[in-house]
Amino acid sequence: MKSPRGRQLVLDLPHRSALGRDDFLVSRSNAEAVALIDRWPSWPTTALALVGHAGSGKTHLAEVWRRMSEAKIIAAQALARSDIPPLLAEGALVIEDAAGTDLDERALFHLLNLAREQNAFILLTAQEPPATWRLKLPDLASRLKAIPVIRLGLPDDDLLRGVIVKLFADRQISVDEAVVSYILTRIPRALAAARALLAEIDRRALEEKAEVTRNFVARILRELDQGSLFSDDEI
């Protein structure tokens, strides 16, 4: 069925990202972080902070560790309404966006103490290191300043190129190398930017029944408001 303008109607269904360890691409910008995650359970402490700006890949890397350790996962803002001890029942826990202003500091401090007592593991994710968080509880601030910080830098060209190629492959879109190179030079250095653009390319290619060529991508980039397209946080 076609729309009045002759374009194919496209169901806006979610695309499932591949988030396994084999799907996580490694380059100089993230190799140190990946190596430390892979060292689990031989971590130097029972808690680590995984830090990186939006689009750096921290959500994907945290998911890699969650699967590896069979950890539970919780948003930091949900700690206030959670029963704390059961969160460490599996021996591992991911706490996402731990630097939020609505963080229950006493709950987090309790979790860190429990992890130490039970030899369980906690991975905190945030955009900034714990030393910069505006905490009110002195004991928590002191404890967090002592935990190792895993930093993810913005993706370098090698990583971003690999991610673009992988995203096309995930969506079963065949493109020339020239298309990948063209995209690489025209998007922000953030994995979220690549995901957002590839999702739009996929949608438009299906809608228009078009081959994904350099000219097709160029037209999409010209027509899009890049500010809105590339402002989303990482998946």
Regions found by a protein language model. Name each.
Residues I147, R161-S174:
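Conserved AAA+ ATPase "sensor/coupling" helix adjacent to the nucleotide-binding pocket
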Residues R66-Q77:
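Post-Walker A helix-loop "phosphate-sensing" segment adjacent to the P-loop in P-loop NTPases
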Residues M1-R39, P44, L206-I235:
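A short, basic N-terminal segment
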Residues I84-A126:
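Conserved nucleotide-sensing/catalytic segment adjacent to the nucleotide-binding pocket
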Residues P130-K145:
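Short regulatory helix/loop adjacent to the ATP-binding pocket of P-loop NTPases
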Residues I147-L159:
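Conserved AAA+ ATPase "SRH/arginine-finger" region at the nucleotide-binding site
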Residues T45-L61:
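Walker A/P-loop nucleotide-binding motif
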Residues S181-T185, A192-L206:
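C-terminal helical "lid" of AAA+/P-loop NTPase domains
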